[in-house]
């Protein structure tokens, strides 16, 4: 999906050295191994790393996410819509939403977002949903998601996918597999 939501500036085009990158690679492999990738059009994994977050860029092969496909987001200004990043690839359009969720709620350190119609159909009526459809990556979508997350740790994003949050990747992983498998 083409990014119309923000402008990106790179502090470095080199791969991030964040020690948490292996967690994103591991969860991608586990989701692939469990057969979930057939129901998913795209997957976004993000982890808090101090004031920064790490997030995967393009979705290609869930089981084969590489270190170079993971970006370290240094900062994001939602007013100016400027993203400051480290890494060799382009950020996903959903990156600002993940950034703002991580920074709006201190207890959220991990997010897994799975997009696709099959995953939506599996979870419709089982978890809370956003009220309105919003543009992916937009501030309006972030507000809808945060409003829905007030009462839980998962949200069905209308016509997009499902988002799970938690204090750790392990907690979020358990939610994903409990709700989907």
Q: What are the language-model segments listed below?
A:
Residues 1-181:
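Glycine-rich flexible loops
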């Amino acid at each position: 999906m083409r990014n119309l939501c923000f402008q990106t500036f790179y502090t470095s085009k080199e791969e991030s050295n964040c020690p948490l990158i292996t967690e994103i690679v591991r969860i991608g492999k586990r989701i692939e191994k469990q057969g979930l990738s057939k129901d998913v059009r795209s997957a976004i994994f993000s982890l808090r790393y101090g004031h920064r977050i790490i997030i995967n860029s393009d979705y290609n092969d869930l089981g084969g996410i590489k270190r170079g496909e993971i970006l370290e987001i240094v900062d994001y200004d939602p007013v100016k819509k400027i993203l400051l990043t480290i890494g060799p690839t382009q950020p996903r359009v959903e990156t600002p939403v993940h950034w703002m969720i991580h920074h709006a709620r201190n207890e959220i350190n991990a997010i897994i977002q799975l997009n696709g119609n099959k995953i939506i159909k599996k979870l419709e009526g089982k978890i809370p949903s956003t009220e309105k459809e919003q543009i992916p990556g937009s501030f309006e979508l972030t507000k809808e998601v945060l409003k829905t997350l007030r009462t839980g740790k998962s949200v069905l994003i209308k016509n997009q996918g499902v988002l799970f949050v938690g204090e750790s990747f392990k907690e979020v992983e358990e939610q994903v597999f409990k709700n989907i498998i």
